Amino acid sequence: TGSANGGSGTYGIYLSEDEGVTWTFQCCGNQPAGPPSLTNINMMGWDKEGEDDGGQYYYDVGLAVDPVNPQKLHLGGVNHWVSTDAGATWVCPAKWSEPGEIGYVHADIHDIRFFGTELWIACDGGIFMSNDGGTNMDKSQVGIEGTDFWGFGASPQSDVMLGGAYHNGTLLKDNDTYINDWICTGGGDGVRGFVNFGNDRIAYDDYEGRILSGDRTMNINGFQFDSLPNASYIFGESSTMEWDPRNN
């Protein structure tokens, strides 16, 4: 269980061995809730050790029991957590920001399911699958065209587009410059992009301006610009940039 308001962190892990008639507190700490620590970990937060406060219980949470070994549990919040003692203790194999680590799963897990002995995890980064109980997690989304742009801009003169694929970075298409058409210009929670109306070599995303090189062997340089007043970050609201034809 967790708190969907206030701290939005882990409240407790409970176990039932009589089909839900009674429940026993398993984790974490000596009692439900309380401040996070090494002995009272918060699995809804961002920290691999579970010592940070808060989290996203209102947004991402998943839980599954291994069909071969009922003592082994998989829990998803921001990170993927594993227990081998029916929920008494937990470890995070790889933090959301450690894509090179064994067992890595993208941040913000929404569902965890077993199909036979295959473990499947759905998250903001797509779908991950394991056929060894979760030790190794592989991205399993080849052929799925599921990139979701929250916002993007395009040049009226050329085939240049820049858009934010929320939680999957900011993506750029610069004519036919890049292999497979698109390149990621930045990670994180990109939600928009703009291409200068009068000069398609200049673009803007959530973090900075971009000077497009037009050559995949050359870097895309960035520059700072005044982002205040800010474009809205709230779902359902719209923000845009307008160009002064006298100076664009």
What does each of the following model-derived ranges do?
Residues 1-248:
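Beta-propeller blade termini and top-face loops
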